């Protein structure tokens, strides 16, 4: 890989984790510059050494950001298919970029008196205080000084950042990163060189991509060029007039709303310019709709400062000015202004905008009620009242006798999951128009979601509903019982098993029963629960023809096997003609041992090919199982079938250890001459003196006249 390629990849990786680095500085240690410098330096060192950051016990608040950075590095290297031998070079170059760029900015930041000094000063005063009133005064003074201190730091930091950005004067347009990367042309950028902060901030985000791997900064400029069909420079001009402070909300990791609104021409860059920098992020947090314009976003996002400015400048589109002034009063909880608007009624449009969950945090729901027509906004009001657990408003909606659809009630019940308000749950479930088994757009029912979020009380309540369907399959072909089993929700399985209408042996699309799923998932406690049900079936077959017992043996699940064993016919053959004992010879010695302890086990049962367990073990050269079988009191060691006796099979398979075990078995009734001939044949087989392996050993007559070396041979076999 070329050096230039390494640098480019390192720059992209830097851009990928830049958001996390900024979060550490702005959100975790916003004013603590020493900690900023220490923690970012630590991250730089860790990335340089291994590409992975170890959690720092001195700063546990960094854990989440460290996890995200580590995952981002892993995902990026995997996506780019970076060769292992190049990774260390990439890590070192990335750490250098962080050090020379991000960390350097922190180091150059002016540091004021540390907050710890203020804390120490006021702690000394508190220790000297003699009364609670005196302590309260000291604490209040401390709060005021801290506020002033933080304000001064914030102002100084902002000024420093602006100076740093502004001082990066662009002297060679062709060498500017935006031009070199082909994001803008020299001609497009030249008229706006004076906006150094914006241009240089855009460069910081140049390597951030969207889901289609398109650089977000590039996407931003493409939107600007195509916004006005007959004037490609107009929106570009509006973009270049923006403050650098708004860049993160335009192309940061959480900028999807604004980009979507711009892309669909619902808002313009001029609209964004009218939004206060501190409020722009709120637009990225709301749930936007296809008909939203800038004022819709401002109201839904509680951008009250921006809204005031738009009212003052008359940029209110088709909205009524009085309505918007009332909205501001609601946001500010201004009782005097609200009283002045007693006669004002909010339109259905504004009422619905205010009843989004984001905006509704900004005002008192009870204040809003006097200004809306409940019939116009019944659905949105029901959702918001449920979210804020306002049972009185919910009852007020119902008392108006508005027709509420089942899907609306279902959605309200979903919302209530977050609070588990039993009164609201009972009230909403009591509606006759409710279809409790209705699927939402994702194919889930109320019961599905209650199980997913482990809401035991809600599951219990839903199961008691007269119309609940417990055997209904979801869009993936699974029942709620299977869902609870897969999620290992033992208490919910208990609740489901108490339902009389439950079909406990119902198969899914793979012909697997709930019991088989629990076994395959190694859910021992759930298996015990299912086995306790009176209607459980143990021998149901899946699409491969295997039963629960087959899978227990195949997967060597000994503990589950012990639980299953009392319920099974231990000598029943499976579809391949094997008994559990024979099946375990190939799969599980632990299960094999457990089966041998059963008094009803048939250790001599032949499979469909006519082989006994002992013969299978001999063919498999499994000396451990041969020894275990020979120790069983019912084992037959001299019975002859189409494969001969066990002794003959041992010789034919050249198994020295098995021969010793058989010859020493008390049920082997042979004289010394016969033993000598067996040993001779075995030695001949080992030495390949028997040339034709196709002739079964049972067809070779024992030569009882051969006695030479008998004592020596017997002694070598421990006889």
From Swiss-Prot:
GO terms for molecular function: RNA binding; RNA nuclease activity. The keyword Repeat applies. This is Putative ankyrin repeat protein RBE_0319. Coiled coil: none annotated. Signal peptide: none annotated. It comes from Rickettsia bellii (strain RML369-C). The keyword Repeat applies. Keywords: ANK repeat, Repeat. GO terms for biological process: RNA processing. ANK repeats lie at residues 377-406, 408-438, 442-472, 476-506, 510-540, 544-572, 576-605, 609-639, 642-672. Gene3D superfamilies: Ankyrin repeat-containing domain.
């Amino acid at each position: 890989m070329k050096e230039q390629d390494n640098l480019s990849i390192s720059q992209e990786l830097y851009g990928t984790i830049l958001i996390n680095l900024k979060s550490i500085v702005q959100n975790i240690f916003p004013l603590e510059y020493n900690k900023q410098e220490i923690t970012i330096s630590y991250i730089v060192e860790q990335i340089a050494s291994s590409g992975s950051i170890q959690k720092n016990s001195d700063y546990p608040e960094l854990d989440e950001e460290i996890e995200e950075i580590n995952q981002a590095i892993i995902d990026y290297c995997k996506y780019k298919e970076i060769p292992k031998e190049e990774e260390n070079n990439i890590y070192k170059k990335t750490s250098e970029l962080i050090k020379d760029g991000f960390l350097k900015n922190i180091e150059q930041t002016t540091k004021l008196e540390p907050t710890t000094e203020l804390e120490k000063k006021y702690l000394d005063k508190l220790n000297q205080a003699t009364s609670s009133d005196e302590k309260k005064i000291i604490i209040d003074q401390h709060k005021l000084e801290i506020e002033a201190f933080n304000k001064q730091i914030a102002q100084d930091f902002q000024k420093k950042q602006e100076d740093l950005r502004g001082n990066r004067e662009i002297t060679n347009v062709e060498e500017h990163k935006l031009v070199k990367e082909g994001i803008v042309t020299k001609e497009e950028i030249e008229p706006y060189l004076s906006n150094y902060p914006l241009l240089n901030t855009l460069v910081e985000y140049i390597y951030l991509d969207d889901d289609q791997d398109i650089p977000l900064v590039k996407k931003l400029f493409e939107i600007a060029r195509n916004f006005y069909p007959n004037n490609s420079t107009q929106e570009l001009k509006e973009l270049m007039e923006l403050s650098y402070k708004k860049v993160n909300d335009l192309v940061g990791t959480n900028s999807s709303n604004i980009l979507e609104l711009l892309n669909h021409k619902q808002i313009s860059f001029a609209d964004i310019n009218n939004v206060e920098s501190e409020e722009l992020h709120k637009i990225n947090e709301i749930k936007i709709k296809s008909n939203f314009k800038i004022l819709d976003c401002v109201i839904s996002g509680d951008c009250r400062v921006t809204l005031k400015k738009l009212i003052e400048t008359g940029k209110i589109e088709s909205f009524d000015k009085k309505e918007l002034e009332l909205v501001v009063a609601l946001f500010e909880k201004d009782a005097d202004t609200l009283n002045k608007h007693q006669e004002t009624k909010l339109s259905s449009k504004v009422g619905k905008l205010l009843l989004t969950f984001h905006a509704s945090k900004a005002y008192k729901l009870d204040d809003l009620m006097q200004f809306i027509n409940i019939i116009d906004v019944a659905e949105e009001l029901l959702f918001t009242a449920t979210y804020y657990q306002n049972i009185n408003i919910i009852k007020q909606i119902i008392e108006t006798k508005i027709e509420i659809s089942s899907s609306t009630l279902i959605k309200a019940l979903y919302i209530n999951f977050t609070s588990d308000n039993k009164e609201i749950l009972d009230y909403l479930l009591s509606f006759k128009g409710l279809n409790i088994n209705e699927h939402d757009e994702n194919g889930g029912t109320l019961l599905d979601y209650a199980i997913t979020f482990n809401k035991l009380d809600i599951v219990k309540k839903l199961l008691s509903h007269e119309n609940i369907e417990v055997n209904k399959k979801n869009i993936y072909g699974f029942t709620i019982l299977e869902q609870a089993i897969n999620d290992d929700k033992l208490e919910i399985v208990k609740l489901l098993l108490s339902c009389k209408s439950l079909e406990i042996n119902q198969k899914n699309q793979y012909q697997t029963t709930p019991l088989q799923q629990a076994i395959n998932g190694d859910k021992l406690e759930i298996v015990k629960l299912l086995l306790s049900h009176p209607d459980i079936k143990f021998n149901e077959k899946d699409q491969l023809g295997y039963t629960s017992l087959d899978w227990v043996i195949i997967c060597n699940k000994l503990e589950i096997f012990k639980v299953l064993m009392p319920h099974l016919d231990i000598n029943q053959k499976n579809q391949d003609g094997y008994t559990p004992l024979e099946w375990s010879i190939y799969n599980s010695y632990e299960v094999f041992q457990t089966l041998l302890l059963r008094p009803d086990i048939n250790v001599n049962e032949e499979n469909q090919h006519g082989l006994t367990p002992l013969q299978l073990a001999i063919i498999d050269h499994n000396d451990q199982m041969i020894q275990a079988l020979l120790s069983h009191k019912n084992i037959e060691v001299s019975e002859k079938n189409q494969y001969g006796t066990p002794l003959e099979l041992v010789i034919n398979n050249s198994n020295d250890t098995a021969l010793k075990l058989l010859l020493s078995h008390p049920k082997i009734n042979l004289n010394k001459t016969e033993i000598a001939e067996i040993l001779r044949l075995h030695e001949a087989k080992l030495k390949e003196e028997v040339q034709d392996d196709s002739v079964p050993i049972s067809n070779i007559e024992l030569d009882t006249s051969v006695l030479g070396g008998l004592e020596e041979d017997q002694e070598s076999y421990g006889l």
